[in-house]
Regions:
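Membrane-interface junctions at transmembrane-helix termini in multi-pass inner-membrane proteins
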Residues: 48-58, 107-131, 153, 174, ...
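Membrane-water interface segments that mark the loop-to-transmembrane alpha-helix transition
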Residues: 1-9, 31, 36, 40-84, ...
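Helix-terminus/linker motif at the lipid-water interface of multi-pass membrane proteins
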Residues: 10-24, 87-88, 144-146, 205-236, ...
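Specific pore-lining/lateral-gate transmembrane helices of multi-pass inner-membrane transport
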Residues: 52-67, 226-330
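Interhelical loop/hinge segments that connect adjacent transmembrane helices in multipass membrane
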Residues: 125, 129, 168-209, 213, ...
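Alpha-helical transmembrane segments of multi-pass membrane proteins
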Residues: 37-38, 77, 81, 91-114, ...
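Signature of the first transmembrane helix
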Residues: 1-44, 71-83, 134-143, 158-163, ...
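Hydrophobic alpha-helical transmembrane segments
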Residues: 95-103, 128-175, 192-194, 200, ...
Length: 330
């Protein structure tokens, strides 16, 4: 299922790259980075807290969901009202007509919490099916709209449908469904766990997105589109890695001692290395043909960044499991 999800997502991006012009991807990259700041702030580590909590109750899930949903809705409104000012500061006023739908995306992302309940219970099949159906729905919508000439809106609406459908199915599959209830005494340990993680998430956001903001501000949407696609395709191997982490992290969280945890860390790193190095070698050797015949001639300016990002993605995939170890220790 993991491979199928990545294949469908990558295949959709490949089709969209052939149907749309690079500037559409540049607009998406800039806006998803700007709006993503609000989305990251709304994620206070509730999902990770649920996975690592040894004696999770319905009230715990209710408290986490209620708090993060309220924060998410508030930040979605903040983006809706403040996007014009933010884009003006960044001198990207031309993107304002595309900004409003991202407020819906910010809010919908807060409905993903039952996925972490499924993963805590090691029900990865249900979690993966929900994620796959979200990817499939978003892909179908995006390609359909692109064929109808909707341009960048095909990418934005596809993103929203992906979040919506995934949320619907994780709620369907989860036996424990969070409710709108809040208990302050249960929020205290959650906040102690989540706030440091939220601060870390902001640094992660900066790490992954500041380059899009810089490229988009000082270059044009087309050049940012080249950069985005060059970055996007190599990092499908990191999508595989993140899905591996959905298995590795709960397993690490269940270890009884540091020795067992270290054995798991070494084994996970070993297999991640084998998975990462093969595409790296292939892209270095055959990158020109992959871009020309896969994406199309219009994407040839993305070749060198594509090769560089593939190597960087491989290195990151090999070294990422320290983060799972850190979280598993609470």
């Amino acid at each position: 299922m993991t491979a199928l999800k990545t294949l469908v997502d990558a295949g959709c991006q490949l089709v969209l790259a052939r149907l749309l012009f690079p500037d559409a991807f540049g607009i998406l990259a800039f806006l998803i980075s700007a709006a993503g700041f609000f989305c990251y702030i709304a994620d206070l580590g509730g999902g990770k807290y649920i996975i690592q909590k040894k004696d999770l109750t319905q009230e715990d899930a209710d408290t986490v969901f209620t708090f993060e949903l309220l924060v998410g809705v508030g930040l979605a409104l903040a983006w809706l009202l403040g996007a014009g000012w933010i884009l003006h500061i960044l001198k990207k006023n031309t993107l304002l007509p595309y900004a409003a739908p991202f407020s819906l995306w910010i809010a919908l992302e807060r409905f993903q919490l039952p996925r972490f309940i499924l993963e805590k219970r090691m029900e990865f099949g249900k979690s993966n099916i929900a994620t796959f159906l979200g990817i499939l729905a978003g892909s179908v919508i995006s390609v359909f709209l692109a064929l109808r000439g909707c341009g960048v809106y095909s990418l934005i609406i596809g993103l929203i449908f992906r979040s919506l459908v995934t949320a619907l199915f994780v709620w369907h599959y989860s036996d424990m469904k969070p409710r709108l209830k809040f208990r302050a005494d249960l929020a205290a340990p959650y906040m102690r766990f989540g706030l440091p993680l939220a601060v870390t998430s902001l640094f992660v956001f900066y790490y992954w997105n500041v380059d899009y903001i810089i490229v988009g501000k000082f270059l044009n949407d087309t050049q940012l589109g080249y950069y985005y696609i060059a970055f996007k395709f190599p990092h499908y191997i990191l999508q595989l890695q993140s899905l591996v982490s959905t298995v590795v992290y709960p397993a690490f969280a269940r270890t009884k001692d540091d020795e067992q945890l270290m054995r798991g860390f070494k084994l996970a790193t070993k297999y991640s290395s084998a998975l990462a190095l093969l595409p790296c070698v292939g892209v270095l050797a055959l990158g020109e043909g992959i871009v020309r015949y896969g994406l199309g001639e219009k994407w040839m300016p993305a070749l060198r960044p594509f090769q560089i990002f593939t190597c960087l993605a491989a290195v990151r995939m090999i070294t990422i499991h320290w983060y799972d170890v850190y979280l598993s220790k609470g």
